[in-house]
From Swiss-Prot:
This is Putative 3,4-dihydroxy-2-butanone kinase. One of its GO terms (molecular function) is glycerone kinase activity. It comes from Solanum lycopersicum (Tomato). The active site is at 226 (tele-hemiaminal-histidine intermediate). Gene3D superfamilies: 1.25.40.340, Dihydroxyacetone kinase, domain 1, Dihydroxyacetone kinase, domain 2. It comes from the Eukaryota. The gene is DHBK. GO terms for biological process: glycerol catabolic process.
Length: 594
């Protein structure tokens, strides 16, 4: 193991929960919900949701960016922070737990960085909370200025400028403003800020091998906070040159990302990405202020320098510039007890953790207990065979998926899919009602939702829920191949609807859509169902391989240059094709030996 991959940790799977426990020991004004490991929520110790008389400000996202977001929980800033696994969006249940814990009659505002997984998970949680009677608004922050105006649905990434939006919203809420006004101030603040980052090294996730993608003497402009590739790799330059370039990109009139012109008042935030010494950050600040004043004709009213939104151990920095007026300055100057704004840690220490709140009584459902049948029907045996083969194939493919994803994403596709597959294999032994295909599909979705973070987890949960609903429409006791095709069609439609992708976007749908087309064609032609599934599996594999030639239109791959995309297929599509093909082959073999 090389030096850069050394970590002061125990189990890589426990880093987020152990970080939260350490944070709470430092600051008596914070608590966490007693729901580890699925629920990882840090909240203000002085807030009780049902009695809280101000708008709650809630944010969060994947961990690995500390002190963001939990370090900015405190009076005058965030009311709660929802922590996902490292670089993975928090799950919907965790977000809902946070909403229920701190939201009173005034409602809550969710401030979400613009990443697909965060948008989907926070969006679904918001809709569920609304159905339970909570008032919820959501503001999405996309302050990235490094890349050209993006194509597709992904949009600009949320970066360190999000913290300035947190502060504005937190101060507005502390004044007692209603939810609509707080949301309006946050939205306006998000439109006033632009950010660009520069990395001298890529980050190393706990338990992962250090990437050598960024070599000696090189820097990467616009590298993402999850390690995804940026706008360009260049030779390392003196800091004066680098800062000048970054500010020109943020303030570029060609992209017009921020409404800042000569004579504007601005706020400057210099943010370390995790491994940059404070000395270097202060050097950057010392260059940036006169550059803004003399070269761009701006009045710099406030400067904040430190490591606020990091990327684990990445060496580098980001600069955020926000257009300011007196109203924004008043919000930024308002008092806060958020420990990493920073503020002191005075006050009595309450209990470190409190129970996870239950849903309101009117929405509590008495769910039936599901279990594995003592005796499997012929249909149950076939379903078990297909599930076991599909999940085992995903387990075996973990390293390949991670290798591909290291080039076009954040390198965790295989690990994420692996967690879901292992959970499916374990839960099937105890809980899956295999004689009931619809309920089994629903339970697969529950297994995935419990352990899989990020966009893959929520999309596969949506996939299973839609397939389950379609299968439940069937009144017959036996599910036929036509029923499975209809369920696959409904699942694909749901993923496309909520995820925003379709054929040609370089996603898992580029494997599943061809599979569905081939399956329906062969079944309509009267083919044997097992043979039809084999042919459709071949179509899935061909579709997945074809993603090498596609320009990404969804997810983090949107930000990756075309020459890198062309070197590997989409990991999500390859995973989908692999489990589909494994299931089809296993069912075919089962029929042949019957």
């Amino acid at each position: 193991m090389d030096f850069q991959s050394k970590k002061l940790i125990n189990d890589p799977n426990d880093v987020v929960t152990e970080f939260i426990e350490g944070l709470i020991e430092n600051y008596p004004g914070l608590q966490y919900l007693d729901g580890f490991p699925e629920v990882k929520v840090v909240l203000r110790a002085d807030v009780s949701g049902a009695k809280y008389d101000k708008v709650a400000i809630i944010s969060g996202g994947g961990s690995g960016h500390e002190p963001a977001h939990a370090g900015f929980v405190g009076e005058g800033m965030l009311t709660a922070a929802i922590c996902g696994d490292v670089f993975a969006s928090p799950n919907v249940d965790s977000i809902l737990a946070g909403i229920r814990a701190v939201t009173g009659p005034m409602g809550c505002l969710l401030i979400v960085k613009n990443y697909t997984g965060d948008r989907l998970n926070f969006g679904l949680a918001a809709e569920q909370a609304k159905s339970e009677g909570y008032k919820v608004e959501m503001v999405i922050v996309g302050d990235d200025c490094a890349l050209p105006p993006p194509r597709g649905i992904a949009g600009r990434r949320g970066l360190a400028g999000t913290l300035l939006v947190h502060k504005v919203a937190g101060a507005a809420a502390a004044c007692g403003l209603p939810l609509a006004d707080v949301a309006a101030e946050a939205k306006r603040a998000s439109e006033m800020v632009g950010t660009m980052g520069v990395a001298l090294s890529v980050c190393t996730s706990p338990g992962q091998v250090t990437s050598d993608r960024l070599g000696p003497g090189k820097m990467e402009l616009g590298l993402g906070i999850h390690g995804e590739p940026g706008a360009a790799v260049a030779d390392l330059q003196p800091v004066d040159v680098v800062v000048s370039h970054v500010l020109k990109e943020i303030l570029s009139p060609e992209t017009n990302y921020v409404p800042i012109t000569r004579g504007s008042r601005v706020v400057l935030l210099i943010n370390g990405l995790g491994a940059t010494p404070l000395m270097e950050l202060m050097i950057i600040a010392g260059k940036a202020v006169p550059e803004l004043q003399l070269e761009h004709g701006l009045a710099v009213d406030r400067v904040y320098t430190g490591s606020f939104m990091t990327s684990l151990d990445m060496a580098g920095f980001s600069i955020s510039v926000m257009k300011a007026d007196q109203a924004i300055l008043d919000r930024l100057d308002a008092p806060t007890k958020a420990p990493n704004w920073p503020v002191g840690a005075e006050g009595n220490r309450p209990p470190a953790k409190i129970p996870v709140p239950l849903p309101p009584s009117h929405s509590i459902k008495i769910e039936k207990t599901l279990s594995r049948p003592e005796k499997l029907s012929p249909q149950g045996h076939i379903l078990e065979t297909a599930i076991e083969a599909a999940a085992t194939e995903v387990v075996n493919l973990r390293d390949n998926l991670n290798e591909w994803d290291n080039k076009v994403g954040d390198g965790d596709c295989g690990s994420t899919m692996f967690r879901g597959a292992v959970a499916i294999l374990e839960d099937m032994k105890k809980y899956y009602p295999l004689n009931d295909p619809a309920e089994t599909v629903n339970e697969i979705g529950a297994s995935i939702g419990r352990v899989m973070g990020g966009t893959s987890g929520i999309l596969y949960s949506i996939f299973c829920k839609a397939a389950y609903a379609k299968l439940k429409e069937n009144a017959e006791s036996v599910v036929t191949a036509i029923h499975w095709a209809d369920a696959l069609e409904a699942a694909i439609a749901a993923v496309s609807k909520y995820g925003g992708a379709s054929a040609g976007y370089r996603t898992l749908l580029d494997a599943l859509i061809p599979a569905l087309s081939a399956l329906k064609e062969r079944l309509n032609a009267g083919d044997d169902p097992a043979d039809a599934f084999i042919i459709s599996a071949e179509a899935a594999s061909a579709g997945a391989e074809s993603t090498k030639h596609m320009q990404a239109q969804a997810g983090r791959s949107t930000y990756v240059p075309g020459d890198i995309l062309a070197s590997v297929p989409d990991p999500g599509a390859m995973a989908a094709a692999a489990w589909y093909r494994a299931a089809a082959l296993a069912v075919k073999e089962k029929y042949n030996t019957a």
